[in-house]
């Protein structure tokens, strides 16, 4: 019995956030013209997962006592880059995905190098680099438009078995591959401490 109470006390913040989410989603679907349908849930999942990816990236930085104001601009840059590179055949799309992920990694490495070796405050560095990343994104896509490989887009925004939003499965995969190992590693435990 004590184990259950301990777990409940330890997770009360997460459970409260989940409860608030359920209440807000219920209000959202009750006010939506289509009501609570599979399409409404799928659309909300697709939009929410994008925000969750950005939030996870920012959380890793904040846990290590930093701040990165360029995360949104890196997300924007990689989206614009994806609209140029993640097209064509399966192999071309795969190379495009690797290039886009590599670009995000490079942007983060640039931020880290400037903070560490340039000895600048993270907030100043990431505001400046965010402006640069935004400028590059505008050079790539001065006007809204572009697309990515339709098969990949359908696979990541569709429904599995006609019910489960694929974007939620992608989010779960990222959590299992990135977040869980980080939180259980020596580095992750040290960051939380």
Regions found by a protein language model. Name each.
Residues 5-9, 122-185:
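Transmembrane helix-bundle core of multi-pass membrane transporters
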Residues 20-36, 64, 137-142, 178-188:
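Structural signal for alpha-helical transmembrane segments and their membrane-water exit/capping regions
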Residues 21, 25, 76-80, 104, ...:
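Residue-level recognition of pore/gate-forming positions within transmembrane alpha-helices
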Residues 25-29, 36-89, 114-120:
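Single transmembrane alpha-helix segments in multi-pass membrane proteins
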Residues 14-19, 44, 52, 73-77, ...:
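Hydrophobic alpha-helical transmembrane segments
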Residues 70, 94-95, 121-124, 186-192:
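Residues that define the loop-to-transmembrane-helix transition and helix capping
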């Amino acid at each position: 019995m004590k184990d259950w109470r301990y777990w409940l006390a330890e997770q009360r913040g997460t459970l409260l956030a989940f409860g608030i989410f359920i209440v807000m989603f219920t209000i959202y679907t009750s006010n939506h013209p289509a009501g609570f349908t599979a399409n409404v849930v799928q659309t909300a999942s697709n939009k929410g997962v994008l925000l969750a990816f950005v939030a996870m990236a920012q959380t890793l930085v904040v846990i290590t006592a930093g701040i990165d104001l360029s995360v949104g601009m890196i997300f924007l840059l990689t989206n614009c880059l994806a609209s140029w590179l993640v097209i064509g055949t399966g192999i071309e799309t795969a190379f495009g995905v690797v290039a886009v992920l590599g670009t995000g990694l490079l942007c983060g490495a640039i931020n880290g190098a400037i903070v560490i070796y340039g000895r600048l405050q993270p907030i100043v560095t990431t505001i400046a680099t965010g402006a640069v990343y935004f400028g590059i994104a505008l050079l790539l896509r001065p006007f809204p438009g572009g697309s990515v490989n339709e098969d990949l887009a359908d696979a990541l925004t569709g429904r599995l078995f006609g019910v489960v939003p694929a974007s939620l499965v992608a989010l779960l995969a990222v959590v299992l591959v990135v977040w869980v190992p980080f939180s259980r590693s020596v580095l992750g435990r040290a960051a939380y401490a």
